[in-house]
């Protein structure tokens, strides 16, 4: 599935159900089978496993075609780079418009993609929360707790993960508020936070694996939907803290 020549890529920004509308660009006749590849970011696996079934029924009713949706998941920035370097994609559903802009700047998407769909082509959202172990043994309540010497943090790498960049921005916004835009203090806060990070995984799901399955760290900075999934799977092991 590695090609240097692309079809037109259909895409949306921050998280993208509506991206599938772009499959209409195919010329396959009614009754034929088609395949589309959705290159997405880390924590959307379960979403698209469910959504693809709904879409397949919708597309069959609308066109008579059977459609097979192939998924590719990883850190958002890494996925964008993979597409730029040759990974075939019919749809991209990434965590940041920055990552999709990079694909556009590489000449693979026509300009104006944000205007193609409502809400700047970002049909759903999440927020950033803390996932802690049941009972919150370190009493972690807010961002300032993450710079304590006794707290080990898990968060993915901002160089490869869209979720990690949102984590970084959320921490920066907190520091901006409590330090009244004093950039020297803000930078010191961020530096200390990342000094407490045990491992910078490449994506949000691998960071969740480090915290949930490997037992690393006292707190995971995560998408809320990713944290909800962990609590759903292991309600006696984890709980969610919503920081300021």
Indicate residue ranges for each PLM-predicted region.
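Short, low-complexity disordered leader/linker segments with a strong preference
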Residues: 1-35, 57
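General small-molecule cofactor/ligand-binding pocket signal
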Residues: 70-72, 154, 200, 241
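Early extracytoplasmic/lumenal segment of secretory-pathway proteins
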Residues: 24-106, 116-117, 223
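Alpha-to-beta junction loops
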Residues: 86-93, 150-152, 213-222
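Second-shell loop/turn segments in exported
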Residues: 34-38, 82-83, 117, 153-161, ...
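A conserved helix-loop-strand patch within extracytoplasmic ligand-binding domains
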Residues: 104-177
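Ligand-binding pocket segment of bilobal, Venus flytrap-like solute-binding proteins
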Residues: 179-243
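Stable alpha-helical elements in mature extracytoplasmic
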Residues: 43-47, 51, 79, 88, ...
């Amino acid at each position: 599935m590695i090609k240097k020549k692309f079809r037109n890529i259909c895409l949306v920004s921050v998280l993208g159900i509506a991206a599938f509308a772009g499959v209409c660009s195919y010329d396959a006749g009614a009754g034929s089978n088609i395949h589309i590849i959705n290159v997405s970011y880390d924590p959307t696996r379960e979403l698209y496993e469910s959504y693809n079934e709904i879409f397949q029924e919708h597309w069959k009713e609308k066109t008579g075609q059977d459609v097979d949706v192939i998924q590719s998941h990883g850190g958002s920035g890494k996925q964008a780079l993979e597409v730029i370097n040759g990974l075939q994609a019919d749809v991209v559903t990434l965590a940041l418009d920055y990552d999709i802009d990079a694909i556009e700047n590489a000449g693979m998407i026509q300009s104006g993609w944000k205007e193609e769909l409502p809400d700047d082509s970002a049909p759903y959202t999440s927020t950033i929360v803390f996932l802690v172990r049941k009972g919150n043994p370190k009493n972690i309540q807010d961002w300032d707790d993450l710079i304590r010497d006794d707290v080990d943090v898990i968060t993915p790498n901002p160089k490869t993960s869209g979720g990690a960049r949102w984590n970084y921005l959320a921490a920066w916004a907190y520091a901006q508020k409590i330090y009244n835009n004093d950039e020297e203090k803000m930078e010191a806060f961020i530096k200390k936070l990342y000094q407490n990070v045990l491992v910078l995984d490449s994506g949000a799901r691998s960071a969740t694996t480090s915290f949930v399955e490997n037992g690393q760290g006292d707190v995971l900075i995560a998408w809320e939907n990713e944290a909800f999934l962990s609590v759903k799977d292991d309600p006696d092991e984890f709980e969610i803290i919503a920081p300021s």
